[in-house]
Amino acid sequence: MHNIHRRHFLKAAGAVTAGLITANITASTHANSVAPKPQTGKSVIGLIAPKMDVVRVGFIGVGERGFSHVEQFCHLEGVELKAICDTHQAVIDRAVAHIAKQNRPQPTVYTGDDLSYRDLLSRDDIDIVIISTPWEWHAPMAIETMESGKHAFVEVPLALTVEECWQIVDTAERTQKNCMMMENVNYGREELMVLNMVRQGVFGELLHGEAAYIHELRWQMKEIDHKTGSWRTYWHTKRNGNLYPTHGLGPVSQYMNINRGDRFDYLTSMSSPALGRALYAKREFPADHERNQLKYINGDINTSLIKTVKGRTIMVQHDTTTPRPYSRHNLIQGTNGVFAGFPNRIAVEHGGFGKSYHEWDMDMQKWYDKYDHPLWQRIGKEAEINGGHGGMDFVMLWRMIYCLRNGEALDQDVYDAASWSVVNILSEQSVNNRSNSVTFPDFTRGAWEHAKPLGIVGA
């Protein structure tokens, strides 16, 4: 194992990084420009990278989420873990030890400061980079990854401003490199089964969807020096909107063929009072603790409504503060029936195994028997063994590598990443303007009208 500190191979990118992390975030409430920007490259809809016999992987960030990816990649065939980068020695040591335990060659380690990742990007023996860092680093790291000739795979959300979204789209088109936001929920067994059912017309013509990220995470406020809560807590003091829209919205978007025959048109959003985090801090921390000095402005519950160009509606909710069970809603309503998640249930007028649509059908097994997605039929057992949010993480990474090794287009592209992530910014703009509607940028520049829907991908 080699420990290599910065060589600053991308000196010119320093100004870009600084601008993205500071100026763009503070400008997030500025008026949204909806006119498509002049295209400087070629559309990457359906982009197919040259086949790779072996996919050589670099990891930026191997903390909580990043280490999970390292674990999953160790179970995949046709990959080499070439390098890892992090600023915390403890998580580096953990990742290195795990890779050794799996009898894989030791990766080169990059550390030293926040820009050490550039040394990893300077290598010419890495094909893809997995980015699992605090949110404000996602956009600059993705851009620099593509500029260095590598494909970028980024944790959610992709970006934090409209301008960042455009910069990432433009870079992908100019470099002809993939930039996939790793929305793992799209690979859940239920979500892929519903996608299969939608494609087979079980629910009829689609009308409405409901998506959410309802996940009580106040406990993360106790992560002070390291881990997710050490930085994520502060976003509740900076922005009032839907901070984390993609887990629920990603699957619903694929059901509705967003960016592939339909697209988001406009959004309206409103937030409840921001009370829960201050109350939690008062209860769990000393009066003079920093957590009690913060002003929490993000509403405990944010609700946004999206209208698509075809007239469909989507409700999107965010709540990581109130005490209630986890949910992503995952509801899709069509002219013949509905699927709703948490708990899973179905009601259809025709083709419902004889059950009336006036009552929920909670017995999922017969639906799985008929509509289970081919990916889960093939690797479901392996996914359940290897874990990762019930197996969805493994299926996502397996599918990514399969596409790269077999010359297939990825299931999610940069336009999906930008469209799903930009809800973060647009919801804030709407909330701050008495819930007036905000228009979505068309990141595809009109190409959505002719793009083919995502099929029932196999393997």
UniProtKB/Swiss-Prot annotation:
Q: What class of enzyme is it?
A: hydrolase
The positions annotated for binding NAD(+) are E64, R65, D86, W135, E136, W137, H138, E155, V156, N184, Y244
**Cofactor(s) needed by this chain:** NAD(+)
| Signal sequence, renumbered to the chain | 1-31
Instruction: Give the protein's biological function.
Output: Glycosidase.
Q: Which PROSITE patterns match?
A: TAT (PS51318)
Which keywords does UniProt give here? Glycosidase, Hydrolase, NAD, Signal
Name of the protein in question: Glycosyl hydrolase family 109 protein
InterPro entries named among the record's database cross-references:
Gfo/Idh/MocA-like_OxRdtase_N, Gfo/Idh/MocA_oxidrdct_glycsds, Glyco_hydro_109_C, NAD(P)-bd_dom_sf, TAT_signal, TAT_signal_bac_arc
The reply on keyword Zinc-finger is: no
GO MF annotation list: hydrolase activity, acting on glycosyl bonds; nucleotide binding
Domain of life of the organism in this record? Bacteria
Q: How is the cofactor bound?
A: Binds 1 NAD(+) per subunit. The NAD(+) cannot dissociate.
